[in-house]
A protein has these predicted regions:
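Loop-helix junctions at membrane interfaces
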Residues: 1-200
């Protein structure tokens, strides 16, 4: 059964409005991720001051929860490139790759689990699994990529994994996950209301 022409027109306008809202919001969250790196950066472990905490994953995780894991991955890649040529330019392509692997694995896993179970348990479980997966990915990445780009012996990297690298990634991702879990529902209500307003 075909819809009346005027209804079809409204349906197209509604879809375009939702798409515009989605793209705009993802863009804003991606930009916010970059800004947060400029504003908040500090080392967690004195023995490894080059490993800095930043809250940049928070807006990207929000994008993944609100619009799906593909949106989170897209936001991750864009934010990583921008950060890699601005605030983190000293780390170059190495920093961009490591950022994409760390945040990308986190938001992909968390976003996929939350998409399958869109409630508080799904959000909590997705973030928890994402933290663990991201830490594992970064442990492997440090063993393979760090020696290639930084000229650090593999044995030296191995010695840093358990006391520094793995705890750092667990702590950083865990902090960001707790914040996302605390703020996502109020923010998601705003997303829903904004979309509903565009229907009227």
């Amino acid at each position: 059964m075909n819809l009346p022409e005027k209804w079809q027109g409204k349906d197209v306008i509604m879809k375009n409005s939702k798409y515009t809202f989605k793209i705009t919001t993802i863009g804003i969250l991606t930009g916010l991720s970059v800004v947060l790196v400029f504003l908040v950066r500090f080392p967690i472990f004195p023995a490894a001051p080059f490993l800095e905490y930043d809250p940049a994953d928070i807006p990207i995780l929000l994008a993944a929860f609100a619009f799906g894991p593909i949106a989170g991955i897209t936001s991750t890649i864009i934010a990583s490139i921008i950060q890699g040529i601005t605030v983190s330019s000293h780390s170059g392509i190495y920093g961009i790759i490591m950022h994409i692997l760390s945040t990308g694995s986190y938001v992909l896993v968390a976003g996929l689990i939350y998409r399958a179970k869109r409630d508080r348990f799904g959000g909590c479980f997705g973030l928890l699994v994402g933290v663990v997966v991201s830490a594992i990915v970064m442990a492997i990445a440090n063993l393979i990529i760090t020696p290639l780009f930084m000229g650090v012996p593999v044995e030296a990297v191995k010695q840093m994994l358990i006391p520094v690298v793995i705890p750092f990634n667990l702590l950083k991702s865990g902090i960001n996950g707790v914040i996302v879990f605390a703020i996502y529902k109020p923010i998601s209500n705003y997303f829903i209301k904004s979309i509903d307003l565009r229907k009227s």
